Amino acid sequence: MCGIVGYIGNKKAIPVLINGLSKLEYRGYDSAGVAVNEDGKLNVIKCKGRLSFLEERLKAEKLDGCMGIGHTRWATHGEPNDVNSHPHISQSGEIAVVHNGIIENYIQLKEFLIGQGYNFKSDTDTEVIAHLVEYYYEGDLVDAVMKVIDEIEGSYALGVLCKDEEDMFVCARKDSPLIVGLGDGENFIASDIPAILEYTRDIYILEDKEVAVLTRDSVKVFNSLGAPVNKEVFKVNWDVEAAEKGGFEHFMMKEMYEEPKVIRDTINPRVKNGELVLDSINITKEDIAKLEKIYIVACGTAYHAGVVGKYIIEKLCRIPVEVDVASEFRYRDPLINDKNLTIIISQSGETLDTLFALREAKKSGSRILSIVNVVGSSIARDSDDVLYTWAGPEIAVASTKAYNTQLTALYLVALDLGLKKGTISKEEANNILASLKEIPNGIEQILKNKEDIQKFAHNHYNAKSIFFIGRSLDYALSLEGSLKLKEISYIHSEAYAGGELKHGTIALIEKGTLVVCPMTQDALFEKMVSNIREVKARGAVVLAITQEKNKTELEKTADMVLTIPDVDSLTAPISAVTPLQLFAYYMALEKGCDVDKPRNLAKSVTVE
């Protein structure tokens, strides 16, 4: 969840580190710091707060060193303050460490180090690593780091400087992402590609327990036993501009405007001669015939995509589907075997709870199909089959375009499995595919008409509590709409199945309560109209979202009707979520919230 950047080369390190950290702000953080090795001295500057605060402190320093590490911290051990910020230095000032992850046995290690005479200044688990590297360091930094990673338990991405090693530094990872960027006379490390994309497109993706040694002219990688590893160079195929705002006020709005393109990019390469072809999924008819159940496992927004996936896969494939929150799945001893398929969904491909859930399912014999957005990510590498969502980099913490492409990918998976199982015909599949291809045009129309949503938000942004209700696929939409609103506007919100209102929720409805009702399912339209009448009778204000064809009828009961272009009920969630995203965006904007970087949240959750 933190951001790590490291540099060694011929440039001054500080500008490279600050630039890289600024590209990782989307990951969420509460403090920042850098360490530079200059003439055999480690200079560490760090502070609580935004990166701009760190830049102010650096103006008073003259740090010209050409090797350094930087970090943005999101607190897991110890409150956000200057002392707990990274980098952490060892007792003698010989070692500096940045760390992302959680060291589970840090208390035992801390007690050992205290017994050896080490004093601790912070409340973090990371300080243990700095002291432990110093404890083992006898002139060989690589050997010391190897010994440390053999002792620590938990997850980590590490960058380690030593004042005596002026021409090299070391990094390592386990269960937390870290990449190495390869330059000409310079090399880099980073938590994510945007931090170093300005300098190189060639990277190494480190595997668990691999250690990399960086000099200006070389990168050597070793496994946990110290044996050299020949790494394959991965070439990044997207541009720096893809991770910039491009004239928009916020990344979130830019990314909503990118939804039509990324949906097309996710569909079009997989349609050949008018038929769906998923080359990356090698599940045969025989494999499908053996399937007794499908699990979908994810967190947050990706979980809500999975709820839609359950409806679609069960309808098109007639296979039971269970949707699980990843953090619950791995601890509840799920009944998994080789007759199951587990679909893993993650934008980053590094979500730690989801990664561990994947490994739990795989250990029990399940086949793993992942839907991820980052090529070469940990989840992708651990999967049997991968379907990439070509959403490009998503910088805003609140997911928008990645969610739309996750939905799109789930529809493609359902079509592929249904065709192979014989539960849908080619004609039915082609009709659904044609409907999916129309979705981008519909979203473009929604974005053109966004002013209606903006006006409604202006009139209702002071709402204290907002309820979302829907049925079937619209209930899944309600879950996501409610989460988006909570994430970025900090307004309390809950989502309920429409049929559950009378079972308790309606007690919360009073005069002026705002209720949002996605209504895209033709078969359930009248049921939802009844729900609207129920809440209206108790004084609620109702915002409804439906196809254009229903507008006139719905205006008789709802206070405000937002429309999406007419689309089949089955595929409607992909376009109907865009008005919900816009609603959350404008509510947050009216309240003066930081839309792209909401409080307490991180983009990529790489700790449990």
How should each PLM-predicted stretch be described?
Residues 259-263, 267-295, 385-514, 588-608:
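Active-site phosphate/pyrophosphate-binding segments
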Residues 155-186, 456, 461-487, 522, ...:
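Acidic/histidine-rich
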Residues 1-249, 261-292, 304, 331, ...:
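Conserved short alpha-helical segments that host acidic/polar catalytic motifs at enzyme active sites
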Residues 226, 541, 567-608:
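Generic C-terminus detector
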Residues 49, 70-83, 272-285, 309-345, ...:
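Glycine-rich oxoanion-binding loops at beta->alpha junctions
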Residues 289-431, 435-438, 520-560, 583, ...:
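Glycine-rich phosphate-binding loops that contact phosphosugars or nucleotide phosphates
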Residues 4, 97, 160, 171, ...:
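Structural beta-sheet core signal
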